Amino acid sequence: MIKDIFPNATVIIDRFHIIQALNNSLNNLRIRVMKRFNTISKDDTKDKIKEKEQIYNQFKTYWKLLLKREDEVSIDDYGKKDYFKQWITSREIVKHLINQDEVLKDAYYTTQMLYDAFDARNYKGFFNIIDSNINTIAEEFSATFKTFINNKSYIENSLRYNLSNGPIEGIINKVKNIKRTGYGYRNFFSLKARVLIVFNLGYSNTDRNVKELIDYDNLAA
């Protein structure tokens, strides 16, 4: 339908959703690896069971660190952390977690390379990394990589242009908050007037047209 209405439009995939897709794939892999440490074998000793529980809790507690750019993970916050006996930094926690599984480790560093290529707006480099790893990376990334390949031209546009859905989505969220904090509006014109006021769109003390839209008795209804 979009192509019919806007036949000459340049389609751009929002960059946020590209990174979100990578993060979701990595996080799903993290969950699969984590669950492995929540399984107890009949041959496990008490010490082994305790070790598994500790690693499981580490994955569950520090999962957000795995989704950050590596250079954004602190190397200076040396101190006591939950589920670690020794003092440790956030960067060391990441290394500890990815060292629990080679597939996770490979996927983590592949994702980091994709982040770098994406941030540098390096379209060719981005897809070279995908092509080089699509047959060897964890299964959680298969659908994501195939989707990227099927939408190459749109992703290229995302890296070429600075346009984004962010401002529009921000406006939509603000309107939703206005409606929520007002406990709903029975009168559409009252809601419209409140939106105009909040966004400073045409409202002034002398604007009779906007004033006529406002049902003051029902403004917060």
Where is each model-derived feature located?
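Short alpha-helix plus adjacent loop in nuclease-associated cores
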Residues: 18-39
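Acidic/histidine-rich catalytic cores and adjacent linkers
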Residues: 1-6, 10, 16-20, 39-221
